């Protein structure tokens, strides 16, 4: 029997700062968002009830260490499946595939990756976007990175004039844009044609193959039933209503 089965609850590491993805509602204290709802749906599949879940706040750079130190059973926090990460943790099949994007002020002269020359780019510590932007710097003379601990800090850096653009997953940027106080002030640019796609997987501690098998079956069933699409669309709409 796996640890979460003995305990009767799954401890899930999720973001608490991204409306629509993983977000702690300051009014209710509830953890909301697409990945939080997906974690509940997985708990229902594996333990019989969606409330058999405990949420643990995770930041990008702490996602893998939290699994390695047994702070959490699984991570659903926009963790892109990459070969080097797969050497450190095990992944389920992808539950969502996104692309690289930029968020810029409305009317910005930034229309694509090459326009970031001489610009300040906000990225999240521990993210694939940080890796990609750092690797792109030699071809972007004068560009600098503004590194934030949380993804929502990307948007805040642009809003406060501390960055000219934010680089993040298209799904994160879309959710944050829709949930912002003034979505009309920003626009999102898809630069996914310049980079590999970003498949998100549920991550677990390395070597926990029985848990991966259970997660794969759960994700496959939720996909097949259209539940993952439903949860995504529900939270996309809810993120937009926050700024209405």
Question: Can you say where each PLM-predicted feature lies in the sequence?
Answer:
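Extended ligand-binding regions for polar small-molecule ligands
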Residues: 1, 37, 41-46, 114, ...
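Extracytoplasmic small-molecule ligand-binding "clamshell" domains
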Residues: 1-75
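Short coil/turn segments
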Residues: 16-17, 29, 80-81, 105-109, ...
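Ligand-binding cleft/hinge of the Venus flytrap
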Residues: 25-28, 40-51, 129-148, 177-183
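Acidic, polar ligand-binding/catalytic clefts
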Residues: 40, 44, 52-115, 192
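A ligand-binding cleft/hinge motif common to bilobed small-molecule-binding domains
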Residues: 62, 78-87, 132-137, 159-160, ...
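Periplasmic-binding protein-like
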Residues: 96-104, 178-220, 236-244
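Ligand-binding clefts/hinges and TM-proximal coupling segments of bilobed small-molecule sensing domains
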Residues: 128-146, 184-187, 219-244
